[in-house]
């Protein structure tokens, strides 16, 4: 272990030394003063502004990058980003984001700057496969605690998905068909194999002030059998093999938008509807007599179908009252996850009987966020006063968990008010302190603070220092779980208090021109996250009494270096990171070691376009190194390990007909990764752990035909 740490330190020192040399050299060269359209961001800003002037370090994945990846949903795109691991659940079909080792409960997911409704609340633990890319303009990522700006759950970071709201053309149309294999399986038949995607986006400028847009997306995943034998199989009573390792899922999404803009006032109304069907096929099929007088037998299986309906309404307005700027969001969101069981006659392919459909997760949200700024009408100093309110009705039935009652119903009203001031001390140096008070009828008042600085070290170089705090409220399971029988005693805890943490980050980026038209941009990052009172399910009485308690301390340390080299039609990006995690766990009389366990990641992307025929080649690579952490097993802590793995995608695109038509083809997951060995999961209080961690369904090939007008 000491040799690994020494090697990692040498790598980081080498990167730092090389970067400093580049920086010294850059001071003697042109600082990219050529005029260009600057990329803008909104996450954490008073108003939309240039990414180089943002006081936060914001990573942007733009529309062209998303298109080049041939991704099918937000999870596919984010999986290419270092230190963001998409965690799939093959049982539920959900995929959530993990940043610096912290799961979906600590990552705030936003669409157009407002949190998205999910199973257990607003913005956290969001299934990213439910976010399509048919009308996405860009994705903004901020790592670190953003509790002042975005409140509960924004401890590891914020992912803000920005949709399209304008067009340069009177009429714009984009339609695409994409067909993919699922590993070696592809079949267009009903209940066939593969993935089938269709989407359409139409935008229309009614006049200089009004714009409207409608988009449609259909994503049908036919499932991946793996070591199982599909829904038609029956008869294995000793070792059931029916079903899928990755269950089938079918999604429909439609979005519509109307936007008005004139002078200093703009507003838009947006509506989004998602329907998802997810099928679970029971591995066990039991013999049933046909009662035909001939001793005939068939096989029945009790299968389950899950259906999700999600509605998102959003109204956004930006205007001025005199010189005071106002930006307000008002949203009503609803998600209802339902299921029904049915008995399926497997050999005859018929449904014998169905049970009524029932809701098992239901969330109903009224949300508003408003911000006032530019009170002093000064370029030197500005401050922002804002509010955020969230009224959530939540419901979870027994299928979602075991609770004190037959179901858990919860109403939460949370109100937050926040204040920050941005002081441009000089043309080169800015500072922004901030504070937030969050009031909840269920928990004690929460206070969060932030302090951000930006120093423009040269014409195209910025050094940012960011400190922030955030909190996380307990979930349904942590508060209300109640699973007690002869063999188990697992209980939630209504007395849990919110988790609290902070992050401290230093970010440096530099850009300059080299000889012969080459341009180089690179950045260095160091980020530390510290979480107190982390909620864990711990043993409180031997041999099998467990309870959720505020017990653990979690620390994460990240060092990263990234570089991008561009010339004409060629670009190369290289990324590296080293992430260390330390967890202080307490379980009865046992305490875990607190040393950091490190994980190395690296990535690269190469893009090249032929000048004359405009054929584009894109290669994406990501390496996730072995990960280690302490796990409790047999009343002692041991090191658990998850093997490393390589991911690579290669895509070729060829435009036709004056760039209106484009044909793309490629291969994803070239190294055919499905699962990796893992000894970090010892199970929970009533289930056994698995020695394999499911990641993907293996190599796939795709073809996409896109029309743009």
Q: Where do the PLM segments sit?
A:
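Gram-negative outer-membrane beta-barrel transporters
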Residues: 424-427, 519-530, 549-632, 706-708
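N-terminal periplasmic accessory domains that precede
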Residues: 39, 74-77, 95-98, 110, ...
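C-terminal beta-signal and adjacent terminal beta-strands/loops
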Residues: 222, 227, 611, 625-630, ...
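Flexible loop and strand-edge segments within Gram-negative outer membrane beta-barrel domains
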Residues: 221-255, 259-322, 326, 334-362
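Extracytoplasmic beta-strand/coil segments of soluble accessory domains associated
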Residues: 58, 75-115
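Membrane-embedded beta-barrel scaffold of Gram-negative outer-membrane proteins
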Residues: 325-341, 456, 464, 497-555
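Short acidic/polar hinge/loop motifs at secondary-structure boundaries
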Residues: 115-143
């Amino acid at each position: 272990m000491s040799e690994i740490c020494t090697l990692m330190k040498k790598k980081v020192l080498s990167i730092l030394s090389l970067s400093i040399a580049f920086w010294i050299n850059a001071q003697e060269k042109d600082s990219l003063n050529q005029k260009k359209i600057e990329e803008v961001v909104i996450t954490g800003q008073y108003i939309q502004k240039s990414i180089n002037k943002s006081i936060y370090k914001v990573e942007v994945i733009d529309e062209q990058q998303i298109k080049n990846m041939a991704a099918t949903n937000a999870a596919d795109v984010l999986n290419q980003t270092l230190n963001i691991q998409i965690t799939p659940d093959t049982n539920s079909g959900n995929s959530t984001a993990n940043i610096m080792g912290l799961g979906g409960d600590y990552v705030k997911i936003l669409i157009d700057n407002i949190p998205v409704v999910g199973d257990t609340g607003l913005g956290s633990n969001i299934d990213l496969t439910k976010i399509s890319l048919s009308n996405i303009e860009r994705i903004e990522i901020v790592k670190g605690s953003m509790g002042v700006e975005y409140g509960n759950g924004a401890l590891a970071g914020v992912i803000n998905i920005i949709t399209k709201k304008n067009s340069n053309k009177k009429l714009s149309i984009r339609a695409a068909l994409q067909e993919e294999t699922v590993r070696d399986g592809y079949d267009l038949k009903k209940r066939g194999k593969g993935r089938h995607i269709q989407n359409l986006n139409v935008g229309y400028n009614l006049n200089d002030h009004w714009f409207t847009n409608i988009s449609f997306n259909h994503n049908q995943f036919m499932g991946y059998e793996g070591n199982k034998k599909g829904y038609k199989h029956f008869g294995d009573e000793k070792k059931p093999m029916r079903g899928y390792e990755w269950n089938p899922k079918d999604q429909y999404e439609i979005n519509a938008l109307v936007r008005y803009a004139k002078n200093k006032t703009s507003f838009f109304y947006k509506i989004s509807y998602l329907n998802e069907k997810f099928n679970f096929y029971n591995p066990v099929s039991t013999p049933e007599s046909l009662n035909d007088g001939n001793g005939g037998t068939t096989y029945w299986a009790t299968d389950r179908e899950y259906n999700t309906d999600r509605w998102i309404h959003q109204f956004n307005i930006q205007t001025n009252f005199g010189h005071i700027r106002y930006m307000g969001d008002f949203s009503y969101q609803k998600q209802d996850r339902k299921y029904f069981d049915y008995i399926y006659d497997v050999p005859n392919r018929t449904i014998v009987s169905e049970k009524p459909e029932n809701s098992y997760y239901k969330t109903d949200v009224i949300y508003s966020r408003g911000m006032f700024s530019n009170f002093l009408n000064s370029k030197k100093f500005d401050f922002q006063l804002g509010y955020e309110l969230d009224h959530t009705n939540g419901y979870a039935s027994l299928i979602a968990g075991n609770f004190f009652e037959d179901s858990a119903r919860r109403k939460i009203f949370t109100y937050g008010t926040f204040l920050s001031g941005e002081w441009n001390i000089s043309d080169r140096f800015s500072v922004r302190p901030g504070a937030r008070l969050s009031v909840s009828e269920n928990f004690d008042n929460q206070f969060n603070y932030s302090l951000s600085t930006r120093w423009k070290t040269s014409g195209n170089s910025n050094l940012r220092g960011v400190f922030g705090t955030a909190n996380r409220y307990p979930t349904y399971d942590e508060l209300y779980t109640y699973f007690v029988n002869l063999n188990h005693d697992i209980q939630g805890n209504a007395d849990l208090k919110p988790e609290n943490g902070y992050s401290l980050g230093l970010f440096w980026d530099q850009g300059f021109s080299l000889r012969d038209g080459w341009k180089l941009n690179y950045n260095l990052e160091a980020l530390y996250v510290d979480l107190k009172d982390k909620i864990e399910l711990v043993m409180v009485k031997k041999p099998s009494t467990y309870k959720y308690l505020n017990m653990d301390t979690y620390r994460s340390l990240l060092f990263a270096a990234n570089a991008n080299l561009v010339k004409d039609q060629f670009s190369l990006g290289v990324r590296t990171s080293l992430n260390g995690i330390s967890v202080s766990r307490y379980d009865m009389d046992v305490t875990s070691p607190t040393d950091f366990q490190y994980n190395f990641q690296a990535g690269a992307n190469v893009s090249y376009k032929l000048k004359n025929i405009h054929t584009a080649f894109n290669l994406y690579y990501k390496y996730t190194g072995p990960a280690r952490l302490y796990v409790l097993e047999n009343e002692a802590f041991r090191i658990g390990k998850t093997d490393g793995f390589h991911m690579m995608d290669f895509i070729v695109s060829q435009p036709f007909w004056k760039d209106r038509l484009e044909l793309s083809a490629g291969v994803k997951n070239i190294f055919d990764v499905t699962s990796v060995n893992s000894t970090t999961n010892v199970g929970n209080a009533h289930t056994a752990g698995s020695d394999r961690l499911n990641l993907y369904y293996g190599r796939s090939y795709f073809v996409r035909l896109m029309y743009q007008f």
